[in-house]
Amino acid sequence: MEAVVFVFSLLDCCALIFLSVYFIITLSDLECDYINARSCCSKLNKWVIPELVGHTLVTVLMLISLHWFIFLLNLPVAAWNIYRYIMVPSGNMGVFDPTEIHNRGQLKSHMKEAMIKLGFHLLCFFMYLYSMILALIND
Amino acid sequence: MSAPAGSPHPAASARIPPKLGGAAASGAAAPAGPGPGPHQQNGPAQNQMQVPSEYGLPPQNYIVPSGHYSQGPGKMTSLPLQSQSGDYYSGLYTVPTQNVATPNTASQQAGAQQMYGRAPPAPHAVGSTPGSFQGASSSASHLHTSASQPYSSFVNHYNSPATYSASSSVASQGFPSTCGHYALSTVSNAAYPSISYPSLPAGDPYGQQMFTSQNAPAVRPIRDNSFSGQNTAVSHPSPLPPPPSRQYHQQQSLSGYSTFSWSAPGLPSTQDNLIRNHTSLATASNPTNTVADSLSCSVMQNVQPPKSSPVVSTVVSGASSTRMPPAANRPVEPVASVTQPSELLQQKGMQYGEYVNNQASSAPTPLSSTSDDEEEEEEDEEAGVDSSSTTSSASPMPNSYDALEGGSYPDVLSSSASSPAPDPAPDPAPAPAPAAPQPSKMPKPFGYGYPTLQPGYQNATAPLNSGGPPSSPVYSGFQQYAQYPGMNQLSSSLGGLNLQSSSQPESLRPVNLTQERNILPMTPVWAPVPNLNLDLKKLNCSPDSFRCTLTNIPQTQALLNKAKLPLGLLLHPFRDLTQLPVITSNTIVRCRSCRTYINPFVSFIDQRRWKCNLCYRVNDVPEEFMYNPLTRSYGEPHKRPEVQNSTVEFIASSDYMLRPPQPAVYLFVLDVSHNAVEAGYLTILCQSLLENLDKLPGDSRTRIGFVTFDSTIHFYNLQEGLSQPQMLIVSDIDDVFLPTPDSLLVNLYESKELIKDLLNALPNMFTNTRETHSALGPALQAAFKLMSPTGGRVSLFQTQLPSLGAGLLQSREDPNQRSSTKVVQHLGPATDFYKKLALDCSGQQTAVDLFLLSSQYSDLASLACMSKYSAGCIYYYPSFHYTHNPSQAEKLQKDLKRYLTRKIGFEAVMRIRCTKGLSMHTFHGNFFVRSTDLLSLANINPDAGFAVQLSIEESLTDTSLVCFQTALLYTSSKGERRIRVHTLCLPVVSSLADVYAGVDVQAAICLLANMAVDRSISSSLSDARDALVNAVVDSLSAYGSTVSNVQHSGLIAPSSLKLFPLYVLALLKQKAFRTGTSTRLDDRVYAMCQIKCQPLVHLMKMIHPNLYRIDRLTDEGAIHVNDRVVPQPPLQKLSAEKLTREGAFLMDCGSVFYIWIGKSCDNNFIEDVLGYPDFASIPQKMTHLPELDTLSSERARSFITWLRDSRPLSPVLHVVKDESPAKTEFFQHLIEDRTEAAFSYYEFLLHVQQQICK
């Protein structure tokens, strides 16, 4: 059972890593002016909810399977994701808004955020991997 | 979706309005065609308008085989040339022949390098005779004088013609191209080869030298002066050095803003000298010379120094000695003299034209020109004509143009960074020593050089020279110089510093705000002038189009943070300009790496290369740029209009279009619901349109269309050939389609009759409508579909909340919260529908202008998104009614007139660039930011302002100037692709005091207002208000703790910031940010929209109205405008204490004028100006001043008219009696007074002081 949880977490984490990389690539494309803000934001906004769901799922799973440490580690990030999603003003087109992304250094902060998440997910990845192997061995 | 072909869409029915009469329904429906699909496909991609990254067509006109000249001697005869040149002048050009000739020559000379190689021979020709020399000098003097007139600084440069001439003679040497010519033509070919080779290498180094060796070369000219009245061959060697000096000059001038001090002081003397020399010389010289000179004068103003490198000089000296024989030329003296001027010219401007002429005139000598040359000349001529015509369009008279340009080449400035380091190294022996004495700051060896020359020249003794080019003479020259213009120059050289020191006291003078009772000046506040040297000041962009909040840019972000002041730009890029140089050329010269347009603040390293002032990359000067269409001269890249004007407009080539320029397309989307009909705007709009139909900007392709909507959407088929307009109704608002996509937007001229019919019919078509709903969203979608193939302007008239279909809105305003002091909600949009649509529109180059005429809440916050992101504009007429509210009706009428007839640019993009190290991070205005520095503007109008916030990313310690450039690429209504470029140059400072000294308080306030709007939308209004107060507190406390060492109990501010608290208080009481006073949400949002998109001048009046007392207008200090005397009453502070019952006051709030009449106002005034016998009989609502034939009435009216004319939108005039209820409107603008909810000015100061002390 334990192994299953971690296998799932591992896969989910992989997906999140890819997503983070995708965010970074797309944002840097925008930074370099390879794509315009509109298409960049519509691309990214599509993946905001999957990311949020994916991460919340792992977090909840850890809570259910009573892995407190991993749960607490994931909690702030999950909370941030949800907060960010909820706090989008009604007139905006999503977390990434093409009309504002170039203002007030938003692009940079988005980039920073994606980087941090990438690091976080990588960390999680190895933790899950380790835990999974441990679980498999224990089984 | 698509309508079935050939038959109306099921939902679409053709309705024939009574007025429209009998068009057959079938007819209407028949055309129903393909759905919207294709349109969209046609639509250009979003990226379309980006400026192509590559420009650079090779300059076609001027490519000439380099080998040309060498051929010359054998083939050619001068005669043909002469005849041609004669034709040129007389026939084609009013301009002197020499000028005319220039293009030809220019083309010939194309290969610069080769020219250099040839240079050495030139000395021969030059050296020949004193007589010739004189002639040359005279020409030079001519030039000088002519040049000098416009600008004093200029004169300095050239102070003494003599030097000039000397240098010029030298210059011929220095200037390879001419020299080459010369050598070939006149003297000895044999000499040529030997000499030429050495020179070639020189050419290469020369670039470097130019750059580095400023000091040394500069000195030389002086020396030259000193020595040589009559220069024989011996003298020549000396002349060689001068060319470097010139270069040097240029460089200095370029580099030099630090150095620039050369200004007026030296002038008088120099001028005298010039004149003297000139006359004497002229007499000496042949008549031909004089003629040539005079001709040349106009052309020649800016001379680029010949580029001989020091190396060259040495070589040359040798050569010159050998050349001595050239004296042989003398026999031909007249000729020689003639030629010399040309040489001079060449030296200066490298003007080949003259050169050619000279050659022609000097028939005897074999000249290099060939039959080939002739052909080329013709071609060039054409080119010349073209260019001249274009320039003439900008400014009819070339002369006036020059005046415009004003600065001659001294103006060409480079950032000091490039130039500052003197390097002796490149120079051969002579140079180094002189280099040292001249600090980079001492600017102008240039200016110096000339004066010194003169004396030398006059003396005509060569003693100094005897030594040849060596350094010693240089010294002497230098010293002389020092003595000579001495004081003047010193002072001028220190000019930059002086300016600072002189300006600082004033702008930094500590002001105790709490004790200064009358803080507001009596006259309008002008933008501070950046602390640059005179030449740069002259060249700098007008503050009306381009302003920076800090006219002294702090060196580092840390310094900026210490100052606690906002750093940003305020732009008004498309302002209506009375004078604008328009430039047509094949290649628009831009930096290869950062794509900056060439501008007055670049530095020319030599004639062939310029250094970008934003990224510091060294670029080549394209061949075409060497030719100056204004003066028709060649080789003066620094005199091109691009380099003489900080605001220019280019006609762009096809490189700058991704599709053919679009026609002007106007679509009117009109609300015709019951509410709208009730308000009655249709009558005014249609009337106004009918009147201005012919004045709509556009060409023969102009298209126009109409869409009306209530709960359904009505299209109008105006296809040419119909007997009457047909109305097509689409009731399927969930899935809007275009019934007849081809005939809804029609050519204005082909269908004019139908359009007029429709406009006449429209106001009465819906009089009996019962439809109260408004399907705005679907109507906009339809408009988008209609416009997307071409792009253009959509004018939307809306009178209520959209209540049907996509984009419907709910009322969000709670009237009870209007005067809440706590939270103001709903400042942001309720839905992203309008934003999305706006972005779609923006992608298709369509802008939506919103006219909101409503009496109730209409959620402007949401609707405005439509215009904000599509780069439209917003007009709001609260409680509009055509009879009940005549002042609004009149305002709409006048606004419409302006709106319909003002200039417009389509499919525009604006890019803002700034010097490396600075970066932009936030933009304010109506547009879509497409990439970090690129604003996408579907339309641009002359009333749109923008603001940009800047941060300093890298330290600017290695530069003393920063530049900002905005380039607005747009399609004019005539279908021309144009680029309007503004460049602003500002100094960098390292001390906090300087930063404070340079604050532009109005710009800072406007930028703060923009930031506060953002803050109140993204966060909350109270946050924004706090931020505003903190801005004052922080900046004043930072000033108090760092700069001012005066210990006062009061609140100390530098003089430059003394109005800061007042303006911030005004902002806090502005509709957009006020709390506690009942403010309707739409009013507030509209005020915010205006803050975002108004240019600074208009915004300032909104923030801080001007109050004048008008019952005692006098002609004292009056100005004359168009034969009218406009009195200029002093500004009064905005406080009730200034209002006396005996007076009448005019308050100018930007969009509204109030005239407040005191209770016991003089009856004479009331009678003379208002036309009523006494106070009691003045009506409550009065919006006009009668045209009475009395002096005071005339004065008052001319004053008000003058105020009105200064702004694009006509303000409404309200006459407010002291006791009328409307007076609260007036009194709420008295921002220095206390209101129930807000501080008085004094209280505010105390509050700030308290905060500082905390």
Swiss-Prot record, chain A:
The chain crosses the membrane at residues 5-25, 57-77, 118-138. Its main location: membrane. Keywords: Endoplasmic reticulum, ER-Golgi transport, Membrane, Protein transport, Transmembrane, Transmembrane helix, Transport. It is found in: Membrane; Endoplasmic reticulum; Endoplasmic reticulum-Golgi intermediate compartment. It is a multi-pass membrane protein. SMART domains: Cornichon (SM01398). GO terms for biological process: endoplasmic reticulum to Golgi vesicle-mediated transport; protein transport. The keyword Endoplasmic reticulum applies. Interacts with Sec23/24 complex components SEC24B and SEC24D. Interacts with CCR5. Interacts with ADRB2 in the early secretory pathway. Involved in G protein-coupled receptors (GPCRs) trafficking from the endoplasmic reticulum to the cell surface; it promotes the exit of GPCRs from the early secretory pathway, likely through interaction with the COPII machinery. Belongs to the cornichon family. This is Protein cornichon homolog 4.
